[in-house]
Amino acid sequence: MIQYVYLKHMRKLWSLGKVRSTVLRFSTTNRNASHLIKNELEQISPGIRQMLNSNSEFLEECSKYYTIAQGKQMRPSLVLLMSKATSLCHGIDRSVVGDKYIDDDDLRSFSTGQILPSQLRLAQITEMIHIASLLHDDVIDHANVRRGSPSSNVAFGNRRSILAGNFILARASTAMARLRNPQVTELLATVIADLVRGEFLQLKNTMDPSSLEIKQSNFDYYIEKSFLKTASLISKSCKASTILGQCSPTVATAAGEYGRCIGTAFQLMDDVLDYTSKDDTLGKAAGADLKLGLATAPVLFAWKKYPELGAMIVNRFNHPSDIQRARSLVECTDAIEQTITWAKEYIKKAKDSLLCLPDSPARKALFALADKVITRKK
C-alpha cells in the first residue's frame, strides 16, 4: 500500500512538472566545474526520458523511474567535461563534426561551441547504460532502497525491473547506432558485455574460491571485477567523447586512462563508504556488501592480518555471526585507511594522465571531480 501511494504521488508530481533533476554536487571551491556544463547537464534527464517514450505507460513508468530521483550524474559530467577539455587539442571546425547524423531536432539546434551535439548524446547514452545496470543490480542484490526511495524491484517487482533495464539498453543501442561512428559503437557495446562479465566474476568472489590464504591474485581479481562493473563505462565513454571530437589517439588513450582510474577509485571509495556511512547518507543500505557475501577491498586488506577471514570469504559470510565478526575485524585494522590510500593512488594516476591536455577550466574541473571521488560522503 505504501509503495502504491508513493508511486501515485510521484506520477502526480511528474504530471505537474514538479520533478526536477539534480546535478553532481561540487564543494564550494569547485562550483565553477558544475557551471561549465550546467546547460548540458540540464538536458541529460529530459533527453533520456524522451528516448524512453513508448506506447506502454506500464513500461514507461518503470524505465523512467530512476530518472525521477536523479543521482549524482557523475558519468555524464565526466563525458561533458572531457569533451570540453579536449576541444582545445586542435583547431577543427567543431560545428560540422559528426552532428548531422544525430536524428534529433533539439540536439541539432543545440550548440555550445565546445561540446558537440553528438557528445551530449553520448553523455545521455552513458547515463542510460548506468541506469539499466542499476535496475539489473537491484534485482540481483535484492536491494530495498535506491537514491533514498524504494528500489525498482521493490516498487515494480523483479520481472518489470529486468525488462525495463533491457528496454533502456535497447534504446541506448539505437542511439549509439545513430551516432554513425563504428568505433564509438564498438566501445560502448563492449561496456554492456563488461557489465555482465563483472557480475559473473562477482558470483565467484575470488580467483580461487577454495583458497584460505590471501594472495596478490585476490587483489588483482578484485580490480578486474571493479573495472568491468564500474570503471569500464567511465573509461570507454570518456574515450568515446574524444573520438567523436576527432582527437588524436594519444588524447583518446589519455581520456580512457583517466576514466579507468577514476572508476576504480570510485569503486574503492564505494567499498569504504559501505563501512563508514549510514543508510540515510548513502541513499541505499549500508553494510550491504558483507550481507551479499562480497570480498571488497577493506575485507581483503583485513584478511592479510586476520587469516580467519579466509574461511568466511570462501563461505560468503553465510554463518550467522560471520558478518558482524568480519566487520569487527575490518574496523580494528587499518584496512579502511589502506583502501583510501589505494584510491588516492588511482586519483593521482587519473590526474597525471590529463597533463597532456592544454590547461583550461574544463581540465581543472576534471581534476576537481577526481578529488571529489575521495571526499564524497555518498
UniProtKB/Swiss-Prot annotation:
It is an enzyme of class 2 (transferase). Pathway: Cofactor biosynthesis; ubiquinone biosynthesis. It catalyses: 7 isopentenyl diphosphate + (2E,6E)-farnesyl diphosphate = all-trans-decaprenyl diphosphate + 7 diphosphate. SUPFAM superfamilies: Terpenoid synthases. It is found in: Mitochondrion. Mg(2+) 2 binds at residues 137, 141. Keywords: Isoprene biosynthesis, Magnesium, Metal-binding, Mitochondrion, Transferase, Ubiquinone biosynthesis. Its cofactor is Mg(2+). InterPro entries: Isoprenoid_synthase_dom_sf (IPR008949), Polyprenyl_synt (IPR000092), Polyprenyl_synt_CS (IPR033749). Its EC number is 2.5.1.91. GO terms for cellular component: heterotetrameric polyprenyl diphosphate synthase complex; mitochondrion; polyprenyl diphosphate synthase complex. Binds 2 Mg(2+) ions per subunit. One of its GO terms (biological process) is farnesyl diphosphate biosynthetic process, mevalonate pathway. Mg(2+) 1 binds at residues 137, 141. One of its GO terms (molecular function) is all-trans-decaprenyl-diphosphate synthase activity. Supplies decaprenyl diphosphate, the precursor for the side chain of the isoprenoid quinones ubiquinone-10. Heterotetramer of 2 dps1 and 2 dlp1 subunits. Belongs to the FPP/GGPP synthase family. This is Decaprenyl-diphosphate synthase subunit 1. It comes from Schizosaccharomyces pombe (strain 972 / ATCC 24843) (Fission yeast). The lineage of its organism: Eukaryota, Fungi, Dikarya, Ascomycota, Taphrinomycotina. The gene is dps1.
